[in-house]
Amino acid sequence: MQDVIAEQIAEGSWDVLFGAGWGYFVPQSVEGSLRTDDKNPLDMLKSKMQVALTPEEFNALRDRRAAAMLERTNYFPKASEGFEITLEIMTRKALDILSNNNKGFFLMVEGSQIDWGGHANDMEYIRDEMLAFDDAVGAVLDFAEEDKNTLVIVTADHETGGMAVLSGDFEEHELVGYDFATKGHSAVMVPVFSFGPSAKLFGGMQDNTDIGKKMFQLWD
């Protein structure tokens, strides 16, 4: 499936895409390829935009359209393992590029491995990935506070692990306990945080599909 997604990405019309998985963008004849055919989505991308495969190339990205695949496989190391180009750095670079469009832009930033930590019932994994995501959110809020015309929405499509926070006295600096109900997804309601113009539209309880509908209304 990843090889097909790589082809669709190369054929798409978008401005910025940063992530991993360069092995799916090069033909099987190239060392490190994860494809089983001779298709070369990477060449198609390079004909359209600036492309980075290394941290050095990423730092040099300047074009209005840019792509980066910074790992061979389709995921990055854990936040705790360290990686030169963090989610925050990718977010700031994306904002730098997209903000040059005077028609505005839409940017989605995902902290994908928070979910993986939930599946593993690994609190330290969840914590580290949440902190990395929080840094990325901070980058967006820095931009929005200066721009004063950017709506920021932070949410999730589901909760994973059925995590519960147990006893502990915050004022006494006691460690708070926790437990998990499942290694799968739960039906727990997820929070929605918003900041900027029309942020009040996203308060209260709502179906998660309403978020997208409201965003389209604002875009129009």
How would you label these PLM feature ranges?
Residues M1-D220:
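A post-motif C-terminal structural segment
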